[in-house]
Amino acid sequence: VFSLEFFPGFKYNTYYNNIPSKARKGGKIMLNEYQKKLFKEVANTIRGLSIDGVQKANSGHPGLPLGCGEIGAVLWGAFLNYDPSDEEAIWRDHFILSAGHGSMFLYSALHLAGYNLSIDDLKKFRQRGSKTPGHPEKLDTEGVEVTTGPLGQGVANAVGIALGMKILGEMYNKDGFPIFENKVVVLAGDGCLMEGISHEASSFAGHLCLNNLILLYDRNHITLDGAFSDSCSDDVVMRYKSYGFDVVEIEDGNSVEQVYDALMRIKEAQEKPLLVVCNTVIGFGSPHKAGTHNVHGSPLGEEEVLATKRALGISEEKFFVPAGVKEFFNERKELMKKKKIHFEDMFSNYQKSYQALAAEIKKLKDHSIPHALKKALQHLSFEEKVAGRKC
């Protein structure tokens, strides 16, 4: 029997701890100087790969990848649980890029994280038949959770996935066996949160108190053809508070330290759906286009690409990944392997105690219909004409 009842007393307790090392100062989770430098290098590598991909294609959106480099570095470098060898791993966290036009941000991060995306694939951005289409496609690219592009759609996708994880948790989690305790993280921009679909989905998430949902709001105050203030005067923070979200604001979304501190605090405890306001600069690092709508959806141009790399202090070599970044993500992959083994050991013990439930979970992972559901569907009957709302 499938139940969609919501349990308001349910508390989310994170099962995994991704913090490479942490110290506290004034209540903050701190990075040491080496870690600051390393995460900044990861952020700039995401930027470099992204603007090179857009420039080679002579088409795309460099603004978001440049503006969200630190967010990407902390997500894949510390926060998210993922398994490049199994994109449907039960224990993984889910990342959705609602602002799908910024797809080179996602492709660059997936490449660094060890997914089946090579440098050659990045070089084929927006080319027919490539693994790197202009907007993320679920069936084309390993590591892409859902197809996105229409602004705001990814927010609704994320709410649906978060609800799905909650339902699975209520069905299958047992004391000592937190099989489904996944975080669902969605990155959305000003344009996404102007769309009606994001309003409706967010309201629903707040109503259900989906405390596994994290909405990262890339607030750069820029839209496709001008300033956000030209077409919208919503108080987004107050709107989300009215939905029932908790709100955290990162004053400088281009600060590794601030992004890390905010996200790792969330990892420790979350009681409601969460809006994380990341105040970023669109096109960060571009000397002549940063902070303007001109960097949103057009290649920088060869001269500006070079100027941006010089301003960021990174190699001018195209599609360059520093050795230190490669080593960091190799170590990260080893950590993820240990977490995979940890989960598999737990699931093995779960299977001994809950054999039938474990079998159902395996079928779900393999996209098979559970026997109970198949049997229930076979016995459904309808009158000849029934309104859809009554089915």
Which residues fall in each region the model found?
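Short, Lys/Arg-enriched N-terminal segments with co-localized hydrophobic residues
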Residues: 1-29
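Prokaryotic Sec-type signal peptides and long signal-anchor helices
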Residues: 6, 10-14, 244, 333, ...
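Intrinsically disordered, low-complexity segments enriched in small/polar residues
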Residues: 7, 24-25, 132, 283, ...
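Intrinsically disordered, low-complexity serine/threonine-rich segments
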Residues: 7, 15, 301, 307-311, ...
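Thiamine diphosphate
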Residues: 29-183, 326-327, 331-391
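Glycine-rich ThDP/TPP pyrophosphate-binding loop and its adjacent helix/strand module
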Residues: 84-85, 137-332
